[in-house]
């Protein structure tokens, strides 16, 4: 009798595990292409193969990216053939300015719907929001797993680096849009918030009842540093301004901030460099 009961429990647990949807997601501010970085030895031409190799190796199912210019987007798609993307340039809703692009594995996931809105008083058109220094945008997609047929929403944003009011009101707007678009469907939110875990904006998200910080709820965590490095490999901080948040429907299995470096140059002339001025965050989820 005891053996029969034990066998039943094992079968139930196995079935529950088999039914759980595994999802690997991430957030990566890849740093926009500019001449100053190139002059300082951190040009996109040398960083791009490293950034893309890192993404290809991790192979997330969905990745929220920030600061992607259109030329960089084309470079990444060429080196990441398993992926497609959604997103528009923030300056005109087409190709101008930075994208908050969402890359997704097109073999694994089917894109059901997508859109974007600006973090401003006029969310449907490009505009500076409140006291922001730059135009800011949020991209979203509705995805369905081709095998399990489970559905989820993915939101990705880049908040302003200057505007305190813009970040606060932008956070409220994102929460409102998540409620409207996703309803009770599981949600992932990624992005460069430009503020850390001690900020008002972080609290707006984590006390909304909709989202939880994956860092705080991970069963297993590898995070030896914060997420902004300013191209300084020896910089140590506890500040996390790049976040991955999920609805309570998700179990956060593993969370990692990956602090990889690479060598630029040959032999004794090589120097250690970082792929971006932000470290990527990757998270294993199940739901």
Please annotate each region the language model reported.
Residues 1-22:
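Bacterial Sec-dependent N-terminal signal peptides
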Residues 18-79, 90-98, 172, 287:
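N-terminal, active-site-proximal structural segment of metallo-dependent hydrolase catalytic domains
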Residues 22-37, 100, 112-117, 150-160, ...:
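Active-site-proximal beta-strand elements of phosphoester/diester hydrolases
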Residues 31, 69, 158-160, 193-196, ...:
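Catalytic metal-binding/acid-base residues of hydrolase active sites
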Residues 62-153, 256-258:
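Structured beta-strand-rich core segments of catalytic domains in phosphoester-bond hydrolases
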Residues 64-66, 88, 188-192, 213-216:
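Active-site neighborhood of phospho(di)ester-bond hydrolases with catalytic His/Asp-centered motifs
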Residues 165, 169, 176-187, 195-287:
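Metal-dependent phosphoester-hydrolase catalytic domains
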């Amino acid at each position: 009798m005891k053996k029969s009961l034990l066998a039943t429990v094992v079968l139930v647990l196995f079935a529950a595990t088999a039914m759980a949807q595994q999802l690997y997601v991430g957030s990566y501010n890849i740093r926009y292409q500019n001449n100053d970085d190139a002059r300082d030895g951190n040009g996109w031409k040398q960083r791009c193969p490293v950034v893309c190799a890192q993404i290809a190796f991790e192979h997330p199912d969905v990745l929220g990216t920030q600061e992607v210019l259109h030329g960089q987007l084309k470079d990444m798609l060429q080196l990441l053939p398993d992926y497609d993307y959604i997103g528009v340039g923030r300056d005109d809703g087409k190709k101008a300015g930075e994208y908050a692009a969402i890359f997704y594995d097109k073999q694994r996931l089917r894109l059901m719907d997508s859109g974007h809105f600006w973090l401003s008083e006029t969310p449907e058109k490009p505009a500076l929001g409140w006291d922001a220094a730059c135009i800011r945008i949020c991209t979203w997609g509705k995805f369905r797993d081709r095998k399990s047929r489970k559905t989820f929403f993915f939101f990705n944003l880049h908040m302003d680096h200057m505007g305190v009011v813009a970040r606060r009101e932008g956070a409220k707007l994102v929460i409102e849009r998540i409620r409207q678009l996703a309803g009770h469907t599981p949600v992932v939110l990624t992005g460069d918030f430009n503020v850390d875990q001690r900020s008002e904006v972080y609290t707006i998200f984590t006390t909304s009842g909709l989202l939880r910080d994956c860092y705080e709820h991970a069963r297993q965590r590898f995070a030896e540093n914060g997420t902004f490095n300013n191209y300084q490999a020896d910089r140590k901080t506890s500040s996390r301004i790049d976040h991955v948040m999920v609805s309570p429907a998700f179990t956060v299995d593993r969370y990692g901030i990956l602090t990889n470096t690479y060598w630029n140059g040959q032999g004794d002339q090589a120097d250690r460099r970082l792929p971006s001025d932000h470290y990527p965050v990757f998270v294993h989820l199940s739901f």
